[in-house]
Amino acid sequence: MDPSEKKISVWICQEEKLVSGLSRRTTCSDVVRVLLEDGCRRRRRQRRSRRLGSAGDPHGPGELPEPPNEDDEDDDEALPQGMLCGPPQCYCIVEKWRGFERILPNKTRILRLWAAWGEEQENVRFVLVRSEASLPNAGPRSAEARVVLSRERPCPARGAPARPSLAMTQEKQRRVVRKAFRKLAKLNRRRQQQTPSSCSSTSSSTASSCSSSPRTHESASVERMETLVHLVLSQDHTIRQQVQRLHELDREIDHYEAKVHLDRMRRHGVNYVQDTYLVGAGIELDGSRPGEEPEEVAAEAEEAAAAPPLAGEAQAAALEELARRCDDLLRLQEQRVQQEELLERLSAEIQEELNQRWMRRRQEELAAREEPLEPDGGPDGELLLEQERVRTQLSTSLYIGLRLNTDLEAVKSDLDYSQQQWDSKKRELQGLLQTLHTLELTVAPDGAPGSGSPSREPGPQACADMWVDQARGLAKSGPGNDEDSDTGLSSMHSQDSDSLPMCESLV
């Protein structure tokens, strides 16, 4: 509904009506009365057009007009309006929202009610139905069909299934509803045709009393059929709203499950499900160790219970700190990935822009070369050519400079990585040299009795220098000089016999 124009939509069977001109004092009874009056006006116009058509093709004195065809399904204009045949007290407006419905009292301010729904207005529908096709109470109810029993022939089998329509297919239900519409339209046409004839007849009172009973029977049948049609269409609206609500709930459930899954992946890793199962299996295996006796298990439980609570609190605090650091690490990792993606995207955009500019400049340069030179250009033409040449050289230099800058950054990153690898190898080599020196001091004899501390001080430094010189010699020598193995480590160790006398002499 548009609040500026004060309009509201009301469904009548399968047709949507827009009621305009509403005010804050408009009630549901006013809307029902307006809709019934509109239906009466439309029926009068249809009857008038039918009479004008029948006047052009008159029937015989005892000939009745042809009944409507049973297979005619295109009479959509007359069907909804032909069913509104009764006083306003026989109709009511039902409010439907997400599969629930309630009967609106006649004194309800419908415009105020519509404004109170707020954001849920798109899920609310107002349906005009007969009062017999809805529940007597005004509370909300779910989509449960009600069976309207016949007053002439009550149902003999009370124990019959309450919902035989559930076993029917959708196409069969559609055919039943269409047949009910056609039958209702046929009864309405017969009643409209018999009304003028009954007013102009001058038969006796006995004949009029005999003809009134079938007319009453037909009117009751029309009312029951109209009630049934309104009930079916009301349930159709309710079912459609429930199906829409189910789709919305499915989308919300999928969104929540995806959010929970991503949260768990962020906290516990990608394979958190597999890790959970493995942890559970490990606990079960630990709990069912075959070689452990119940007494030992009880003793371990008592020791765990007798442990001081401070250890448990410290462990819990350590776990919390570890979890916090893990969360921080994950957050930093995500930020790093985002920054890398942004950097790659910007680099690709810059490269694409440079390529486009280069190609544009190149095309302009080729086009300028292909154009013939004007003989009367004079110094202006030469100046333009010189300016174009300088601009082309400048763009070329800019492009080449940017490419060289990119290559320089790549070389710098490779150089930093190589420097880091060299530092790590250097530290590893120094650690190996220190370990080897310690082993040599352990294996060597304790030394001469007259040796003192000043004579032992230059020993490690001299050994370290010697091993560095040997390592440099191995690095300079090719792989063909290594006779023991391919790595060269065995040749390094093969020089132990040469280095031991020097160490011993220094000691």
UniProtKB/Swiss-Prot annotation:
Residues 68-78 have a biased composition (Acidic residues). It comes from the Eukaryota. GO terms for cellular component: centrosome; cytosol; spindle pole. Residues 487-498 have a biased composition (Polar residues). InterPro entries: N-RASSF, RA_dom, RASSF10_RA, RASSF8/10_RA, Ubiquitin-like_domsf. It is found in: Cytoplasm, Cytosol; Cytoplasm, Cytoskeleton, Microtubule organizing center, Centrosome; Cytoplasm, Cytoskeleton, Spindle pole. The keyword Lyase does not apply. Residues 4-133 form the Ras-associating domain. Expressed in brain. Tends to be down-regulated in astrocytic gliomas due to promoter methylation. Methylation occurs early in gliomagenesis and the extent of methylation parallels with higher glioma grades, so that methylation is observed in close to 70% WHO grade IV primary glioblastomas, but not in grade I astrocytomas. PROSITE patterns: RA (PS50200). It holds the Pfam family RASSF8-10_RA. Keywords: Coiled coil, Cytoplasm, Cytoskeleton, Neurogenesis. GO terms for biological process: nervous system development; positive regulation of neural precursor cell proliferation; positive regulation of neurogenesis; signal transduction. Residues 197-213, 447-460 have a biased composition (Low complexity). Residues 237-264, 319-358 form a coiled coil. PANTHER family: RAS ASSOCIATION DOMAIN-CONTAINING PROTEIN 10, RAS-ASSOCIATING DOMAIN CONTAINING PROTEIN. Plays an important role in regulating embryonic neurogenesis. This is Ras association domain-containing protein 10. It comes from Homo sapiens.
